[in-house]
Swiss-Prot record:
Keywords: ATP-binding, Chloroplast, Fatty acid biosynthesis, Fatty acid metabolism, Lipid biosynthesis, Lipid metabolism, Metal-binding, Nucleotide-binding, Plastid, Transferase, Zinc, Zinc-finger. This is Acetyl-coenzyme A carboxylase carboxyl transferase subunit beta, chloroplastic. Gene3D superfamilies: 2-enoyl-CoA Hydratase, Chain A, domain 1. The lineage of its organism: Eukaryota, Viridiplantae, Streptophyta, Embryophyta, Tracheophyta. It catalyses: N(6)-carboxybiotinyl-L-lysyl-[protein] + acetyl-CoA = N(6)-biotinyl-L-lysyl-[protein] + malonyl-CoA. The gene is accD. The keyword Nucleotide-binding applies. GO terms for cellular component: acetyl-CoA carboxylase complex; chloroplast stroma. Pathway: Lipid metabolism; malonyl-CoA biosynthesis; malonyl-CoA from acetyl-CoA: step 1/1. Belongs to the AccD/PCCB family. Zn(2+) binds at C227, C230, C246, C249. One of its GO terms (biological process) is fatty acid biosynthetic process. Residues 223-491 form the CoA carboxyltransferase N-terminal domain. It comes from the Eukaryota.
Length: 491
């Protein structure tokens, strides 16, 4: 493994020039290799680092000598880049493309020091002279605030990494990868340690943080939940009282089936059904990584559930209801034979008792470890729903949460008399990655979101989580299902 030394004071133009980025740094095209001959100073580390350590003035010549004279593909094959400021503080980036590793040693003092150095350099007479000659970066503004400086650093690394990764498509394949880490210090103030967006042809690139950051992240993990949309951190103890809704942007985070039951069902009225029913690996599914039975056991320990759905009877504002709630935390909410059987028995019970039915969907689809048996659950549940709705003339409400995909979407998820979706829920039959890999077509962004599908007529209302219980209560009363105490008062 090699180690390279960079002077830290780089303008965007110089990084483009020194690294051979002939295109805009904001574009995501491949880096073009330069044809400059190798400089002898590349083989002499002392020559590479003298200007950054022995001079307080800015210098970029080492970067030009370093990068332009070597093959850019091999440049980050297995190298550690050590960026140092004028005071000698270091900041290292380790690349190993072959083993798909990108490791950053985060130094909290680095960005602030680098920002100060960059500001001085940006206003230097050399850069001003280049501006007078018209040598500016695509006419972009030369004024940088604190936020734009962070964005500038992130964009430079984004473009550079993306170009390198795309040049070797045999290594990576898959979807976009978004990585963002937040660290909390002892006083509880948030500091964004580093942010980057790696848009690649693959999702297998991993980022390893320094051991210090991992320790801090693990230390505060039990206190905070990060929003999937705005990346804000929500205090975990308060998040439950807010029904799992991000207080910064209003995004509906995933919540457990138990939390959802607590949200919808009146306290003290929940009576679970068939909670002792477990899968017995009906087809003897073989896996080299982990046996199916062992995987079931591990998820049971992790979630405290026996399967990916909870079913039972309860009251919603005094109205008796049969409710099934799927839990995405248990094997992605996948539908196996036990899940199908529990939902089938719930529907049959609701038919016999003439009570309304609610099923909250959160699933990746049929469970592959049970083969055709899991697929048959689609037909079994649909047939018993036909009897419940068409013959008994009873009322079924389907609630689609994020994500609802595959066999659940193709069966009982879309069979409700009223189909309700949560805001920004991901609802689809085939996932985006599957469609793109199968048809070689790009799926438009947001085309599988609830708001887009609502305008296509796929379901009825989009109801925020905090209003859901009231909406369901009004729907039931509209269909002549009234609270028990109200019926007794009328008698």
């Amino acid at each position: 493994m090699k180690k390279w030394w960079f002077n830290s004071m780089l303008s965007k133009k110089e990084l483009e020039h020194g690294c051979g980025l002939s295109k805009s740094m904001d574009s995501l095209g491949p880096i073009e290799n330069t044809s400059t001959k190798e400089d002898p100073s590349l083989n002499d580390p002392e020559k590479q680092i003298h200007s950054s350590r022995n001079s307080e003035s800015s210098s970029y010549s080492n970067v030009n000598h370093l990068v332009r004279g070597i093959d850019i593909q091999n440049f980050i094959s297995d190298d550690t880049f050590l960026l140092i400021d004028t005071k000698g503080d270091s900041y290292s980036i380790y690349f190993d493309i072959e083993n798909q590793i990108f490791e950053i040693d985060n130094d909290h003092s680095f960005l602030s020091k680098l920002q100060s150095s960059f500001s001085n350099y940006w206003n230097s007479s050399y850069l001003n002279s280049r501006s007078k000659n018209g040598d500016t970066y695509n006419g972009h503004s030369l004024y940088y605030t604190n936020d734009s400086w962070n964005n500038h650093i992130n964009n430079c690394i984004d473009s550079y990494l993306h170009s390198q990764i795309r040049s070797d498509s045999s290594i990576l394949s898959g979807n976009d990868s978004y990585i963002l880490s937040y660290i909390f210090n002892e006083s509880g103030n948030r500091s964004e340690s580093f942010s980057k967006r790696s848009i690649t042809n693959g999702s297998n690139l991993t980022r390893r943080e320094s051991s210090h950051n991992l320790d801090v992240t693990q230390k505060y993990r039990h206190l905070w939940v990060q929003c999937e949309s705005c990346y804000a951190l929500n205090y975990k103890k308060l998040l439950k009282s807010k029904m799992g809704i991000c207080e910064q942007c209003g995004y509906h985070l995933k919540i457990s089936s138990s939390d959802r039951i607590e949200l919808l069902i009146d306290p003290g009225t929940w009576n679970p059904m068939d909670d002792d029913m477990v899968s017995m690996d009906p087809i003897g599914f073989h896996s080299e990584e982990e046996a199916y039975k062992d995987r079931i056991d591990s998820y049971q320990i992790k979630t405290g559930l026996t399967e990916a759905v909870q079913t039972g009877i309860g009251q919603l504002n005094g109205i008796p209801v049969a409710i099934g709630v799927m839990d995405f935390q248990f094997m992605g909410g996948s539908m196996g034979s036990v899940v199908g059987e529990k939902i089938t028995r719930l529907i049959e019970y609701a038919s016999n008792k003439f009570i309304p039915l609610i099923i909250v969907c959160a699933s990746g689809g049929a469970r592959m470890q049970e083969g055709s048996l899991s697929l048959m659950q689609m037909a079994k549940i649909s047939s018993v729903l036909y009897d419940y709705q068409s013959n008994k003339k009873l009322f079924y409400v389907s609630i689609l949460t994020s994500p609802t995909t595959g066999g659940v979407t193709a069966s009982f998820g879309m069979l409700g008399d009223i189909i309700i979706a949560e805001p920004n829920a991901y609802i689809a039959f085939a996932g985006k990655r599957v469609i793109e890999q199968t048809l070689n077509k790009t799926v438009p962004e947001g085309s599988q979101a609830a708001e887009f599908l609502f305008h296509k007529g796929l379901f009825d209302p989009i109801v925020p989580r905090n209003l859901l219980k009231g909406v369901l209560s009004e729907l039931f009363e509209l269909h002549a299902f009234f609270p028990l105490n109200q019926n007794k008062g009328e008698d």
